[in-house]
Amino acid sequence: MANHPLTLEKDGFIVTTLDAAMAAAQKNSLWYMTFGLARCAVEMMHAAGARYDMDRFGMIPRASPRQCDLMIVAGTLTNKMAPAMRRVYDQMAEPRYVVSMGSCANGGGYYHYGYSVVRGCDRIVPVDVYVPGCPPTAEALVYDLMQLQRKVAERSTHSRPKLFARP
């Protein structure tokens, strides 16, 4: 028998692990909801438009947090809006991811010293990827979303305890 790697064309089957299958499925089906609060939200709309087309990466916008596993926070987060953002995050499906887009969402930005500004959305929800810039370009958002996809694909089922927990 020849020493060759297993392929679908030669052997008629594919060998994989549950980790690899779950990672590939989840990586290519990130459904996102936008939490647009300022100018960065306009750049987020550009990324979802025809020129950059986030749909080709398997990222589909959803209106309900219960159908989403990715939240993109774009803009200045105020103290009054923080509880609403946390409530939306808690309603999202597990496993869930957060992208902080722009200087205001990352650390308060231009309004950092304002009395009503939260100095970074990572004080309210855990953030997986930060997109720098004021406002960040659509290219930067798409690049960081691809980095998030890589991060999701590298996770194993060991880090997803709720999905495979025994009753």
UniProtKB/Swiss-Prot annotation:
It is found in: Cell inner membrane. GO terms for molecular function: 4 iron, 4 sulfur cluster binding; iron ion binding; NADH dehydrogenase (ubiquinone) activity; NADH:ubiquinone reductase (non-electrogenic) activity; quinone binding. The keyword NAD applies. It is a peripheral membrane protein. One of its GO terms (biological process) is aerobic respiration. SUPFAM superfamilies: HydA/Nqo6-like. Its EC number is 7.1.1.-. Its main location: membrane. It catalyses: a quinone + NADH + 5 H(+)(in) = a quinol + NAD(+) + 4 H(+)(out). NDH-1 shuttles electrons from NADH, via FMN and iron-sulfur (Fe-S) centers, to quinones in the respiratory chain. Couples the redox reaction to proton translocation (for every two electrons transferred, four hydrogen ions are translocated across the cytoplasmic membrane), and thus conserves the redox energy in a proton gradient. Belongs to the complex I 20 kDa subunit family. NDH-1 is composed of 14 different subunits. Subunits NuoB, C, D, E, F, and G constitute the peripheral sector of the complex. NCBIfam families: nuoB_fam (TIGR01957), PRK06411.1 (NF005012). This is Putative NADH-quinone oxidoreductase subunit B 2.
